[in-house]
Amino acid sequence: MAHKKAGGSTRNGRDSEAKRLGVKMYGGQAIKAGNIIVRQRGTQFHAGYGVGMGKDHTLFAKVEGVVKFEVKGAFGRRYVSVVAA
């Protein structure tokens, strides 16, 4: 009789769901208060004028205007601001 031995198990076989991180609104785009600008882990981008930061480091617009990205300071930090259109 033909037989096939039972296959072994592996410790792989799972994968986490993508978190959809990244820049959601780019420089020069019009934005409304409350809209998300960047979803991130840690502060890759820092909050500038008119921008708030959530507890998961998400940057969002506090005022209506246009998104502006800039590099400031001796450490070359990247800031996101919302300026009036």
From Swiss-Prot:
Domain of life of the source: Bacteria
Signal sequence segment: none
UniProtKB keywords: Ribonucleoprotein, Ribosomal protein
GO cellular component, one term: cytosolic large ribosomal subunit
A Pfam family it matches: Ribosomal_L27
SUPFAM superfamilies reported in the protein's UniProt record: Ribosomal L27 protein-like (SSF110324)
An example molecular function term from Gene Ontology annotations: structural constituent of ribosome
Similarity annotation: Belongs to the bacterial ribosomal protein bL27 family.
NCBIfam families, sorted: L27
PANTHER family per record: LARGE RIBOSOMAL SUBUNIT PROTEIN BL27M (PTHR15893:SF0), RIBOSOMAL PROTEIN L27 (PTHR15893)
Protein name, entry field: Large ribosomal subunit protein bL27
Organism: Stutzerimonas stutzeri (strain A1501)
